[in-house]
């Protein structure tokens, strides 16, 4: 977070239209590894490692959300299945399958709650035709205030600029940074 603080002081993020953290799933593993320090190689412990990591990740995301630019965070999905029943004669299992954010513990629930827009990128066919799911359709957990307000459809093309424009927001790029390096202001 120190790097973010330094960049905030220099006005670095005022030159960004969008900041992307790719991916939360990988970032979480780094946070846990850093938190474990000299215990590297051991299995992470729930209270000692996972809970502090979850709090750190949530606080870091809140800090990123306060930047003067749009924020996109990508993450992997994890398949979760819930057994509904088993047919006694055939042995066929009936399960409810959902795909949720792949992160630690309760962050599966708490991190998505920080966002107004939670989308899932899907693909159909071969080669896959990509589209963004903006609403909970079957097994994918997505939601959108913009969709709820009638600005977006349940499935949209995978173009963030077009989504912004469709919802009535500016999709213009910010001007390029001048040749001098913003980091030089620190030195």
Question: What residue spans do the PLM features occupy?
Answer:
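Short glycine-rich substrate-engagement loop in P-loop NTPases that contacts/grips substrate
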Residues: 1-12
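Conserved, well-folded catalytic cores of nucleic-acid-processing
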Residues: 7, 27-30, 74, 114, ...
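P-loop NTPase motor core
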Residues: 18-110
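Conserved GTP-binding G-domain of TRAFAC-class P-loop NTPases and closely related GTPase folds
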Residues: 79-187
